[in-house]
Amino acid sequence: VFINAMGMRITEEQRAQIKKAADGGLPILTTSVTNPANEIISLDSIQADTLRSYLGNGGRRNYRSMLNYVRKHIDGKLISVDEPEAVTERSNDMIYHADPKKPDDEELGFNTIAGYNAFLQENGLLQEGAPRIIITGMMGEPADLIRKLEETGNVVYPVRNMKGFIGRHQIDSVFPSAVINMAHGRMGDYIVDYLAQQNIPLFTPLNVNRLVEEWENDKMGMSGGFLSQSVVTPEIDGAIRPFALFGHYRDEEGLQHAFAIPERLETFVETVNNYIKLQNKPNNEKRVAIYYYKGPGQNAMAAAGMEVAPSLYNLLLHLKKEGYKVDGLPASSKELERMIQAQGAVFGTYAEGAFDNFMKNGHPELITKEQYESWVGKVLRPEKYAEVVSSFGEFPGEYMATDDGRLGVARLQFGNVVLLPQNAAGKGDNAFKIVHGTDAAPPHTYIASYLWTQFGFKADALIHFGTHGSLEFTPKKQVALSSNDWPDRLVGALPHFYIYSIGNVGEGMIAKRRAYAGLQSYLTPPFLESSVRGIYRELVEKIKIYNNAVNACSNGAHEQESRKDMRSEVDLRRASLAVKAVAVKLGIHRELELDSVLTVPYTEDEILRIENFAEELATEKITGQLYTMGVPYEDARIRSSVYAMATEPIAYSLLALDKLRKRADEKTVKHRALFTQHY
């Protein structure tokens, strides 16, 4: 029995059972032990070392010899067993490739680009001018991926040691268009620097590391250490498209083997090729679909912290400046907004008159049943489409439908750039729930818009404009999506870019992982001070008088005669009532749920709460005008934003240092006004 004990967590009872089997004569070898308690070996040292050597060097030949060694020298089967060969040391080849003439044999190895290119040339795999793609990493079986990439016109360089490949400058003569990393952990800063220098994408297809049917039925998709190592840490390297590609299948003996999932392989390779096409296709030929968000009727477009209409208009102007075909662009953002209200609207089911007018004058794209069903057949499994029909009826449904059975898709087209509203992803009155996810399939209108973008408009790139839409919240898996999950199907193989607020990292991660989006950050509105300190000036003065009275009482108890002590108590009561009068006048007592009886003084703790509340409001950060893409902050707004972001971390760091030096105590922490004054 071979046990890979890396990270293995078993109970004491389970461990005892394994030890009992080993003591009873069952041959057991544990490898990659991370917990010494799990190191259970019932072989002699020679046998254990021999098996470790076979495993450590890997390869078909070594594994075959290892099994023969087990049969002959451990299991005692001496008849009809081939003599095990000596261990073949693992080659340190930089590049590997299956032998096209003997694909089931050991992979061939190469240490020079010239030698590998000669091999490719000899086997008809080196195409002049073809994109070159590097594959690296260990969390997958890349044979089918390499073959499919080559079949679709690429030259593939499977690399064992990417760091060495870059460090020794062997990569310099490859000029790759993309890197594919079958990731388990970070590659490191060296790859970040290289990707930035070359301006090429890094893809990280996922190995779900279990039977395909188990993964497809799992609502989570991936979790724990595999999520961290396969999705989270590769994002630090700049990886995009965490697309489930590899899974396990059983052979005729019931053993599991990792392979590329056939339908996923087709989509992934098409995705990689589509990104590479963007590098080479002239800008005036690229077709771009941009989705924006707005509520029904005359509601304005929306995106967190952004002035949408002028920002979208600035993007269109910039695309035109960069050579994209943007025809018929209006003269101003106001005019663009008017056009969107007329031709790119979203309607509630109640707005029959406005809907009829839109269908006549809004120039929607009209989709026939034949078109729609042909597109659905390409991307959706029958059972997924059955969910749609069950919830919304047969195409075209009741919404955005014409009398002759076609479905209207709102859009504004400017040459090769089309603007589309994102329709509601469900039905009902709870807009927040519809945007942030339900368990139901999206309606025909939602699906048809995205499928028209893919197959009708034939977009080269998909953009979602602003934070945030509903696509990344459609059902079902959290990450490592399958072909049964709606974002996976509606994005398809399109390169996807999401203009996303830099202030919403958490939901941005959802867009990256569930909608395969490359995030392009936009700024939050600038930060300003609240400017309400003047409102609380009288209150602050009264609290200062009260604090002085508290100090006088504390000192008087030990040093002053009883008469002066009584006078201090009277002053303290008077000061507390004065604070209370101002606090009640300002309504602070309601916020803090304090009483408003003006003849009963507040306690010291209650006044401390009032002081901290007022100080918190006085120092609270507020945001200024909404951000417009392409328009930099004014200098004053840059300064106020930097102060707002940096002041508190610096102040609390200084406080921490003063506490270490015994220059500050808990009193400073409790009194926000004192903290603000000192730091």
Question: What residue ranges belong to the model's regions?
Answer:
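Ligand/cofactor-recognition surfaces for anionic moieties
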Residues: 1-679
